[in-house]
Amino acid sequence: MDPFSQLSQLQQNLQAMTKTVAGLENDMLEVLKENTELKVENQLLREKISKLDANKEPAENKSQAGLKSLRNIYDSGYHICNMYYGSHRESGEDCMFCLDILDNFVNHGQKNRG
């Protein structure tokens, strides 16, 4: 192969490599752009999760306060069940309907935490 042909082929190879490098550069810019967008989206989602968690905590506290109120009413000798709500219980008498409500209230709260 003569030197002119070699130079011509080398020039063609160089042009092909230049196109390949330009393509890789464009691909890299797209990946970097997507990466930046995903980082921003990730940060926004983390902030939303933090807000949701912050809103969830007071609901759990309200739930515990509600359970405590029901327990106090029941321990004071009054029914909290639908059938006898507000009526006085005899001393030492347990109501299975009231106890069922308290038990479900406690179990429901534990499921939400798990």
From Swiss-Prot:
Its cofactor is Zn(2+). Keywords: Cytoplasm, DNA replication, DNA replication inhibitor, Metal-binding, Zinc. InterPro entries: YabA (IPR010377). The keyword Transmembrane does not apply. GO terms for cellular component: nucleoid. Zn(2+) binds at residues 79, 81, 95, 98. Binds 1 zinc ion per subunit. Pfam families: YabA. Signal peptide: none annotated. One of its GO terms (biological process) is DNA replication. Disulfide bonds: none annotated. It is found in: Cytoplasm, Nucleoid. Involved in control of chromosome replication initiation. Inhibits the cooperative binding of DnaA to the oriC region, thus negatively regulating initiation of chromosome replication. Inhibits the ability of DnaA-ATP to form a helix on DNA; does not disassemble preformed DnaA-DNA helices. Decreases the residence time of DnaA on the chromosome at its binding sites (oriC, replication forks and promoter-binding sites). Tethers DnaA to the replication machinery via the DNA polymerase beta sliding clamp subunit (dnaN). Belongs to the YabA family. NCBIfam families: PRK13169.1-3. Homotetramer. Interacts with both DnaA and DnaN, acting as a bridge between these two proteins. This is Replication initiation control protein YabA. It comes from Lactobacillus gasseri (strain ATCC 33323 / DSM 20243 / BCRC 14619 / CIP 102991 / JCM 1131 / KCTC 3163 / NCIMB 11718 / NCTC 13722 / AM63). The gene is yabA.
